[in-house]
């Protein structure tokens, strides 16, 4: 009899405390997620030489836009630049 009362109280305690543990885990995920997103954004917003191998879909939902530019101004040498852009 005492054992069954113990188990009933034990399961009630587990059921009562468990949502607190889940809430704590969700809070931790929410705290670390913006840091991870911010790091990803910094690594994605860089100049590229090509739109190939777009790591982890960095440009999504944007698109990777490439163009050629002359480097330095009096030279005929052209350099290809690519960047993630909304338009």
UniProtKB/Swiss-Prot annotation:
GO molecular function terms listed in the Swiss-Prot or TrEMBL record: calcium channel regulator activity; toxin activity
Predominant cellular place of this UniProt entry's protein: secreted
Top-rank taxon, per record: Eukaryota
Secreted keyword on record: yes
Signal peptide: 1-17
Disulphide bonds in the chain: 44-59, 51-64, 58-84, 66-82
Propeptide stretch(es), residue numbers: 18-40
Subcellular location: Secreted
Record text about domains: The presence of a 'disulfide through disulfide knot' structurally defines this protein as a knottin.
Function: Modulates Cav2.1/CACNA1A voltage-gated calcium channels (P/Q-type currents) in rat cerebellar Purkinje cells and hippocampal CA1-CA3 neurons. At saturating concentrations (>10 nM) decelerates activation kinetics and slightly increases peak amplitude without affecting deactivation kinetics. In vivo, does not cause death when intravenously injected into mice. In rat models, through its activity on Cav2.1/CACNA1A, has an ameliorative effect on memory defects provoked by hyperstimulation of N-methyl-D-aspartate receptors (NMDARs) in the hippocampus.
Note in the entry: According to the nomenclature proposed by King and colleagues (2008), 'Gsp(267)' comes from the species name 'Geolycosa sp (strain A267TDLS2-KZARNA)'. This species has been reclassified since that study, as indicated in the work of Oparin and colleagues (2016).
Family affiliation: Belongs to the neurotoxin omega-lctx family.
Protein name: Omega-lycotoxin-Am1d
Origin species: Alopecosa marikovskyi
